Amino acid sequence: MRKGVLNPDRDRQIVEHELQETGFSPETEKVKNKNFEEDEEEEDESVEKIFESREVPSWKKQLTVRAFVVSFMLSILFSFIVMKLNLTTGIIPSLNVSAGLLGFFFVKTWTKMLHRSGLLKQPFTRQENTVIQTCVVASSGIAFSGGFGTYLFGMSERIATQSGDVSRGVKDPSLGWIIGFLFVVSFLGLFSVVPLRKIMVIDFKLTYPSGTATAHLINSFHTPQGAKLAKKQVRVLGKFFSLSFFWSFFQWFFTGGENCGFSNFPTFGLKAYQYKFYFDFSATYVGVGMICPYIINISVLLGGILSWGIMWPLIETKKGDWFPDNVPSSSMHGLQAYKVFIAVAIILGDGLYNFCKVLSRTLSGLFVQLRGPTTSISRTSFTLEEDPHASPLSPKQSYDDQRRTRFFLKDQIPTWFAVGGYITIAATSTAILPHMFHQLRWYYILVIYICAPVLAFCNAYGAGLTDWSLASTYGKLAIFTIGAWAGSEHGGMLAGLAACGVMMNIVSTASDLTQDFKTGYLTLSSPKSMFVSQVIGTAMGCVVSPCVFWLFYKAFDDLGLPNTEYPAPFATVYRSMAKLGVEGVASLPRECLVLCYAFFGVAILVNIVKDSLHSNWGRFIPLPMAMAIPFFLGPYFAIDMCVGSLILFIWERVDAAKAEAFGTAVASGLICGDGIWSLPSSVLAIAGVNPPVCMKFLSSATNSKVDNFLKGSI
């Protein structure tokens, strides 16, 4: 739930669902520009001079009961939304604006009521707002990094049956062990970067665009002009939240059977519907399309056209030649293998290229920084508010920086506490995890924990330069290395998937916390309050997210199955990666490996071309990561997203100012309303209440057969 500037690396972060582990993926440039424009006149004076007369509360007073009550409420809301997105397509847009707006609205309403009754003891400050933002990001982020749509669900028998490798080991979800696993692995990353906070934020002056933009959002809320706009945005969000919720409620009445309802409307005809080209009336993905950059939506649509419009129909003609003609459509020895492994090849190619690119930037930037203290890292990073090269005579820079640095260094977190916490949690985790996963030997875990601080630093440093977390890439690296080390005969698949979870949680939370330190630095929030808020939010997420997943798991018996409401596509992808790591490529159908190599190379080539072209032309090159998603799922959600883009495009042409101010609020309302409908729909399913009507679309010929059958049976 972070915001930042628009760039190709961050565009990928929005679409690869794993890269939402930076909290939530960054917002687009239009949202950032909106906040900058709102604050433009104020910043001419200096941001901190605006707040100079307001007392900065101590770190303990920043941690209020009302802040954590609001955070808990919002965490439940956003956990449902993220879980639904995780289990449908895996595309999780930035919900940062929603969290910031709703957090501001709830506490502001609370304090206003107390003020009228004469019971208000502490005003609502930007520091408290930052605590809420941090807590909600940490909590609902577990709904993603917990692996409910990836590595964790990929261990289940339901996913293993689709992959045809049940014998390789399964571990079905259970509320007890999932909560225990998350508590064991989710806190370690927080301690790994605490000693480096001053180096990252003050000495290296890393910009962390998402954290900086989030701070701008919060600062703007607490100015008179920003508060007025925030109230209007909340009203708009609430209006479209209600519209989206009741639209989902209305659609539910017509889903009383398989492939029933508006979500199966054959918009472009039945033949196109067969290849998943249709508009499914999803308010969620229309909203996602309004938030995601245009190039993301176009890339996803192009990927859908390339795969479902061209490749899969052609490969289907090779049935009986390239693969057996008697295997079911879901078999990994048939067409399904091409869908999954070609998508995996593109994801790995794109991930490998960008891993090398970000790592090279990280190492070169670090080398330059260590060589000379006067050399600024900002040459290879994004500049939002701070300019390390600014003249020391600049009153704005000197005053703001001095005040922020003074408050940032005021509350120190002892190094012994961070080191001791890391060692204690690592030792506890090393002892407990082998009992949860007997395939994951204690020495595998020990190796991960020895390497983790270095990788966590690299990830946090790289995020400061590029605003892009590579946690999912480190997780995939763990799948292959630990899986191959364990071997096929010793449970390598489960060991690799479990190791993926351990690694992802460490490096993900490390970059998240460093982003939060940057946000806290710019809002004068104490590092101690940021750390405590992150810990409490993570603890909330370790309980809330498994409970939300469990509700989905118990309510929908077809969860994780292809062509259902919740196919959980990346669970199959992650298990396929683990299978590839322990078995090699011998089990793939004919020509599948050749196609995988080809698309792996094409993904790297497209990235090279995109980065080598001038930004004016490179921004038109599609993103391989985005193109890979519909290879497995189909292009129906891409059509929804493009509809969202079209709505926003027309709105910007008609009234650009209102589109900038309220576009994200409208999109967030659409996403939140449809997402929260998952709660009552799950409860209805558990209670055995079924929709009363099945609205299904048939061809004329099929309809005649059905009519004749019904007449004959009367």
Swiss-Prot record:
What are the leading ranks of the lineage?
A: Eukaryota, Viridiplantae, Streptophyta, Embryophyta, Tracheophyta
Record GO cellular component, one term? membrane
The transmembrane segments are 67-87, 90-110, 135-155, 175-195, 236-256, 295-315, 340-360, 413-433, 445-465, 477-497, 531-551, 593-613, 631-651
rRNA processing as a keyword of this entry, yes or no, is no
Instruction: Give start-end positions of Basic and acidic residues composition bias.
Output: 27-36
What is this protein called in UniProt? Probable metal-nicotianamine transporter YSL5
Q: Which function does this protein serve?
A: May be involved in the transport of nicotianamine-chelated metals.
Q: Per UniProt, which keywords does this protein have?
A: Membrane, Transmembrane, Transmembrane helix, Transport
